[in-house]
Amino acid sequence: MKVSKVYTTIDAHVAGEPLRIITGGVPEIKGDTQLERRAYCMEHLDHLREVLMYEPRGHHGMYGCIITPPASAHADFGVLFMHNEGWSTMCGHGIIAVITVGIETGMFEVTGEKQNFIIDSPAGEVIAYAKYNGSEVESVSFENVPSFVYKKDVPIIIDDYEFQVDIAFGGAFYAVVDSKEFGLKVDFKDLSAIQMWGGKIKHYIESKMEVKHPLEEGLKGIYGVIFSDEPKGEDATLRNVTIFADGQVDRSPCGTGTSARIATLFEKDALQKGEIFVHECITDGKFEGEVLSVTAVDTYEAVVPKVTGHAFITGFHQFVVDPRDDLKRGFLLG
């Protein structure tokens, strides 16, 4: 056996959505900001993403993270997230998992009953709070970047279907649509059709308009499509599944998607400041969300959302790359 690379990871999940935190084997990542570091990874470290996200070490739905030194003077650390298509700008379930793993493995030092962390992400500064009992994390909440409705009631015509979507930012840009527009339910049996529609809607919007953040050139494009449905659980407000990247299915309620959904509900006067919004996902897991404050992003009215969930560690791994392996860079099916 020959080994050219060794990577260590800690894996976790949030409502079924995986996060693989890469703890060893990562070279120096250059850049003064997280957006610059993300761009560096896209140009120089995409092989690492392919090796650890793709089969045979990962799968089509795998999500990953690298914890970096802080980019700003007052932050505790930075994060860079990756998936089956590339490098994302922010990931809410990833924040929940990173804080949980960091505390439960002793990576992060905590004192008192609650601990907050200031985190640099490519989308901006995120503040996370952990509620824990000894070494066990009970839940993690995070105050996300200002989230806003970019365009509402955008008309879409695809395959003789006419419907409208709202486009909102919650750390990334999402199109929000009701699943009933297609006669579908947010359930396993309709998932293939939902994936198909997610890809079509994303490509349609990006062919018709440029979606970009008014203050940050590096934040642009439709990241995912949120399909909204009536909840199954009596304690839930809405049910959803998010299709993002290259047809990837978010098993969790989607942290940045929940933030975008909070912005759309607030815009429609369907959610008030301080009111709890319970977002249910396709695995029946739930996030709690609320509007903490109202602010502005350029000319857009925005909200600062808070999202709460919990994560569980699933394993500690050591992956190797054999230079003789024709599939050493990985592959994707599905």
Swiss-Prot record:
The Gene Ontology terms for molecular function here are: 4-hydroxyproline epimerase activity; trans-L-3-hydroxyproline dehydratase activity
Q: Record keywords: Nucleus included?
A: no
Known EC number: 4.2.1.77
Key words, A-Z:
Lyase
InterPro entries referenced in this protein's UniProt entry, alphabetically: Pro_racemase_fam
- Disulfide-linked positions: none
Q: Which domain of life is it from?
A: Bacteria
Q: Does the keyword Lyase apply?
A: yes
Which SUPFAM superfamilies does UniProt cross-reference here? Answer: Diaminopimelate epimerase-like
Q: Where is the active site?
A: 91 (proton acceptor)
Q: Name one Pfam family in it.
A: Pro_racemase
Record's catalysed reaction(s): trans-3-hydroxy-L-proline = 1-pyrroline-2-carboxylate + H2O
Residues binding substrate: 92-93, 250, 255-256
What this protein is reported to do is described as: Catalyzes the dehydration of trans-3-hydroxy-L-proline (t3LHyp) to Delta(1)-pyrroline-2-carboxylate (Pyr2C). Is likely involved in a degradation pathway that converts t3LHyp to L-proline. Can also catalyze the epimerization of trans-4-hydroxy-L-proline (t4LHyp) to cis-4-hydroxy-D-proline (c4DHyp) in vitro. Displays no proline racemase activity.
Concerning its family, UniProt says: Belongs to the proline racemase family.
Q: What is this protein called?
A: Trans-3-hydroxy-L-proline dehydratase
| UniProt lineage | Bacteria, Bacillati, Bacillota, Bacilli, Bacillales
